[in-house]
Regions:
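Short amphipathic alpha-helical segment that frequently serves as the phosphate-/nucleotide-binding helix
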Residues: 61-69, 177, 181
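N-terminal catalytic or cofactor-binding beta/alpha core of small enzyme domains
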Residues: 44, 86-88
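The first long alpha-helix at the start of the GST-like C-terminal all-alpha domain
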Residues: 65-86
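Short, flexible, glycine/charge-rich loop motifs used to bind or transfer phosphoryl groups or to couple energy/partner
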Residues: 34-38, 76-77, 116-117, 148-151
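Active-site and ligand/interface coordination hotspots across diverse enzymes
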Residues: 1-66, 77, 156, 193, ...
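Glycine/proline-rich loop-helix segments at beta-alpha junctions forming the active-site rim
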Residues: 2-5, 26, 83-84, 91-213
Length: 213
């Protein structure tokens, strides 16, 4: 087990014992609302969404629902990579009741977990999905104005590529889906093969770190 795996496993244990916000304290319709990131610990790409949905709290992995299927489709057909080569996580680690948007207090409570994930994995680029992840890294709001344009996050000292969230609500809108497809093509051109397909794939470690989806 490499040091990145050990660090992420320890961070996940901290996350699952967190009681910093009302959701983690029991203000949710699920017994365990926490969902930690998972994937390749040596990934060149880290994907960051908003927060886990209800189905993710059951499986305990991010992006396993329809949004995840949409995203996987874009990865495979446009970027020509599989999910096993990336690391996926969320800005908020808990399912919000009724899948409502997270509050500022909830975002603040989870901030250190995401920051540490990025520091441990050390990707070349972060793909943000939707407004909340965009705001976390860039302080900008309004994905319609910022999507598809690479920019640098000063706080994290990393390149960030904002994209529309691949939710069914978004992808069922022809213009939004077309924009998402164009953004993936633009990302592929910007990367120009610089993102590695690392071979050190992290499977389930047996100590609590989720393996691949």
């Amino acid at each position: 087990m490499n040091s990145k795996t050990q660090k992420l496993a320890a961070l996940k244990r901290q996350c699952f014992s967190c009681k910093k916000c009302s959701i983690a304290q029991g203000d949710s319709r699920v017994t365990s609302p926490h969902v930690f990131g998972c994937g390749n610990v040596n990934a060149s790409i880290v994907v960051v969404g908003q927060n886990p949905g209800y189905s993710e709290t059951i499986i305990k992995k991010p992006f396993v629902g329809d949004a995840g299927k949409n995203f996987d489709g874009f990865l495979q057909t446009i970027l020509s990579i599989e999910r096993k080569y990336i690391y996926i996580t969320n800005t908020i680690k808990c399912y919000t009741p009724g899948n409502r948007p997270p509050t500022d207090q909830e975002i603040a409570a989870c901030k250190d977990f995401l920051k540490q994930e990025i520091e441990i994995v050390q990707p070349q680029v972060v793909i943000t999905l939707g407004n909340y992840a965009l705001q976390y890294f860039t302080k900008h709001s309004g994905i319609t104005k910022c999507h598809g344009e690479m920019e640098h996050s000063e706080e994290f000292n990393i390149d960030v590529f904002p994209m529309y969230h691949p939710s069914p609500l978004n992808m069922n809108k022809p213009l939004t889906r077309q924009a998402a497809e164009e953004d993936f093509r633009k990302l592929k051109a910007l990367l120009k093969g610089s993102v590695d397909k690392v071979s050190d794939i992290t499977e389930d470690s047996g100590i609590g770190l989720e393996g691949l989806i």
